């Protein structure tokens, strides 16, 4: 098969998609390259539809091969094993979300999209290549797909918007978002920003949409050049007579049930209406329960949308821009370092903050290199929060994605390491959920930080926006319920301070969004954020002056860089002993800065004194009790503190003449000595005799008397001359 090559230009660099040479047995395959980053994206699908499937059976996988960055995996087996990394999970979601709405209703063939990172240049992130490759592979495959779409990353560097900035440039960008779109408009947005206005964010989003259009052009060229004929999908026909009869039987009851203000009451009322429907239809429809359930769900969705679009109200009675009642509490857990309970309507989230030292930083192996992360946020969504019974397992893709969104929204307001040198872990425990638990996570975790005395730059709140649209009728909803998310057309989450946006995430179920709708949603979200922020600040208006008494205290000691080796000791022996002795955590960096994390002042005092004793250069006149560690003919080397030895010359051992060093001291002896001199090179001269009492005159003369001479010695001969 002939290889086809298609090329566009993004930010002055070639963006290439190739097909026809690799993975030819897949339904579609695209090799995507930008810079020296290359990904292979494949799509495969079952030949028969999945029986009784009432959902889209699509799975998306993203695999980072460590060899792509010229490295060998650091685990015991030296191969890629185990569950996907956090980065892989997030990129799976990023790839899945824009393509999922573009499959037709009634498509039930099991479908799998796999992205494999083959080459990584550490400057161009593979995530946007994965989205483009997935669209390209689906576009040329035989699968029905209402694409193509494309994606770019948008950064703002020194006030200038840039498409697909490099990883190095992103460090200096105050906007970092991924924009996915079709030719007609924006489909998905995900990213963060360093407190920018709604107008600036809107400009960045549509700058990204313009930048991705050339990538859609080359996919159209691919489809024309090598696209396969599409499968014909015939969705199951609706029984319109049955649909009408269901509406006649329970339409009014559904309209009444969905307007129950509380989630459980609404769910219970709809369940009763559905049971009444089965009874009303009778035994003649007993074998069509699955079909009836589907038609009933369609009716509920239709009624809910009608209430919003034609009656101008929401199913729980709120106005379109109204936020549910909010309550906030701080300091709810006495022994944690910071805690807060945030409740908005029937969504309740407990935020807990823990402080640690540099030892507690998360260490991660990525294609960009090994990283340490001093800030972590973990989101937990137990089944009881929605009244369900499920097996409790590790974090799901959804949990990781929601936690990452909250992490991004908060990270921009955290203090830098120079101001607050702690590792921070936030945990979100969702206790109740009826929409927007990720935004509840942001609010509860910010309050937990403030309760724990973390000097954040500004408080952050978050809100989830929804959309119901039908032709010219459009309703933008603030603080959506779970049901509004289900029957609506958009889920748009925005976090920010009073002054601007810190993170956003948008997914839609329709083909695209116009600029006008996005602008309205952003400004309505700002009003909601400010309202929520006001309620939060009523609970705690400013971060506390002091951290929790149960949190570790960080103390800084400076030593000369030459002393680092002595602090650490051979194989880390000395620093381990210091930590065990003082019950502290001690870190030393290359500049000679020693950080001591202690739970009490007494533990800190012990560690500080020990470090200072090792790190300080002895001065003449100081007295130490040391240990003899080496003996030579000319003296004894005495260790006066960890890693520091000095020489006590044989002449400095006693006031009288010493024939052999071992006549006075032996290996391991404890000896009190005085520092006589410290040379510029750091060599230390010690004296033992300086601390001994001066001998009596006669005793000194006796011990110092000359040794007896042999008869006939030289002295006599000299005298006889």
Curated annotation (Swiss-Prot):
Residues 687-721 are annotated as: Disordered. Residues 621-689 form the S1 motif domain. GO terms for biological process: mRNA catabolic process; RNA processing. It is found in: Cytoplasm. InterPro entries: ExoRNase_PH_dom1, ExoRNase_PH_dom2, ExoRNase_PH_dom2_sf, KH_dom, KH_dom_type_1, KH_dom_type_1_sf, NA-bd_OB-fold, PNPase. GO terms for molecular function: 3'-5'-RNA exonuclease activity; magnesium ion binding; polyribonucleotide nucleotidyltransferase activity; RNA binding. Its EC number is 2.7.7.8. Disulfide bonds: none annotated. Its cofactor is Mg(2+). Mg(2+) binds at residues 485, 491. Involved in mRNA degradation. Catalyzes the phosphorolysis of single-stranded polyribonucleotides processively in the 3'- to 5'-direction. This is Polyribonucleotide nucleotidyltransferase.
């Amino acid at each position: 098969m002939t290889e086809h090559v298609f090329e566009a230009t993004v930010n002055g660099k070639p963006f290439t998609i190739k097909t026809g040479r690799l993975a030819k047995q897949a339904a579609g395959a695209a090799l995507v390259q930008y810079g020296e980053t290359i990904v292979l994206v494949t799509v495969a699908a079952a030949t028969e539809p999945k029986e009784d499937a009432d959902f889209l059976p699509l799975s998306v996988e993203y695999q980072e091969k460590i060899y792509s960055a010229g490295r060998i995996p650091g685990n015991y087996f030296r191969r890629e094993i185990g569950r996907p990394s956090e980065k892989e999970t997030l990129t799976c979601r990023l790839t899945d979300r824009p393509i999922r709405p573009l499959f037709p209703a009634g498509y039930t063939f099991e479908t799998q999209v796999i992205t494999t990172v083959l080459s990584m240049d550490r400057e161009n992130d593979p995530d946007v290549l994965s989205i483009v490759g997935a669209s390209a592979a689906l576009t040329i495959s035989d699968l029905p797909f209402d694409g193509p779409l494309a994606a770019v990353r948008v950064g703002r560097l020194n006030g200038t918007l840039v498409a697909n900035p490099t990883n190095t440039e992103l460090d200096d960008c105050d906007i970092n978002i991924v924009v996915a779109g079709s030719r007609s408009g924006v489909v998905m947005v995900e990213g963060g920003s360093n407190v920018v206005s709604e107008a600036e964010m809107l400009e960045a989003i549509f700058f990204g949409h313009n930048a991705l259009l050339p990538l859609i052009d080359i996919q159209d060229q691919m489809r024309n050049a090598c696209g396969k004929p599409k499968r014909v999908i015939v969705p199951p026909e609706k029984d319109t007579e049955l649909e009408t009869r269901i509406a006649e039987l329970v339409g009014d009851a559904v309209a009444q049930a969905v307007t129950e203000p509380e989630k459980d009451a609404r769910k219970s009322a709809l369940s009763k209406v559905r049971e009444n429907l089965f009874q009303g239809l009778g035994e003649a429809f007993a074998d069509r329960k699955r079909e009836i359930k589907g038609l009933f769900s369609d009716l509920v969705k239709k009624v809910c949308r009608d209430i919003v679009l034609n009656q101008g109200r929401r199913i729980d009675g709120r106005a379109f821009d109204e936020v549910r009642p909010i309550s906030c509490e701080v300091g709810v857990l006495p022994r944690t370092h910071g805690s807060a309970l945030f409740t908005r309507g029937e969504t309740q989230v407990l935020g807990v903050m823990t402080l640690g030292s540099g030892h507690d930083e998360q260490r991660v192996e990525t294609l960009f290199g090994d990283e340490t992360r001093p800030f972590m946020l973990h989101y937990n969504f137990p089944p009881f929060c929605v009244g369900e019974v499920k097996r409790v397992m590790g974090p799901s893709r959804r949990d990781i994605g929601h936690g990452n969104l909250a992490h991004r929204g908060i990270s921009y307001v955290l203090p830098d390491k120079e101001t607050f040198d702690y590792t921070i872990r936030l945990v979100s425990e969702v206790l109740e959920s009826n929409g927007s638990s990720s935004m509840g996570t942001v609010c509860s975790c910010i309050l937990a930080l403030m309760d724990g005395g973390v000097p954040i730059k500004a408080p952050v709140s978050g809100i989830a926006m929804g959309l119901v649209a039908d032709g010219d009728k459009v309703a933008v909803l603030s603080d959506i319920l779970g049901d509004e998310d289900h029957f609506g057309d958009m889920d748009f989450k925005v976090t920010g301070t009073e002054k601007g946006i810190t993170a956003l995430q948008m997914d839609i179920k329709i083909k695209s969004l116009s600029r006008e709708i996005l602008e309205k949603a952003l400004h309505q979200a700002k009003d909601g954020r400010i309202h929520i922020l006001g309620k939060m600040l009523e609970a705690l208006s400013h971060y506390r002056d002091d951290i929790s008494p149960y949190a570790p205290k960080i103390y800084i000691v400076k030593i000369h860089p030459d002393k680092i080796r002595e602090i650490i000791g051979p194989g880390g022996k000395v620093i381990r002993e210091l930590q065990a002795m003082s019950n502290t955590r001690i870190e030393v960096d290359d500049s000679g800065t020693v950080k001591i994390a202690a739970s009490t002042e007494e533990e800190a005092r012990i560690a500080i004194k020990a470090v200072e004793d090792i790190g300080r250069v002895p001065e003449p006149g100081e007295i130490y009790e040391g240990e003899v560690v080496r003996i030579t003919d000319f003296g004894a080397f005495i260790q006066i503190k960890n890693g520091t030895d000095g020489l006590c010359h044989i002449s400095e051992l006693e006031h009288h003449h010493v024939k052999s060093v071992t006549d006075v001291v032996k290996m391991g002896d404890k000896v009190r000595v005085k520092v006589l001199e410290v040379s510029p090179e750091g060599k230390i001269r010690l004296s033992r005799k300086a601390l001994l009492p001066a001998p009596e005159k006669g005793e000194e003369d006796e011990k110092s008397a000359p040794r007896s001479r042999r008869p006939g010695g030289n002295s006599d001969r000299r005298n006889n001359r």
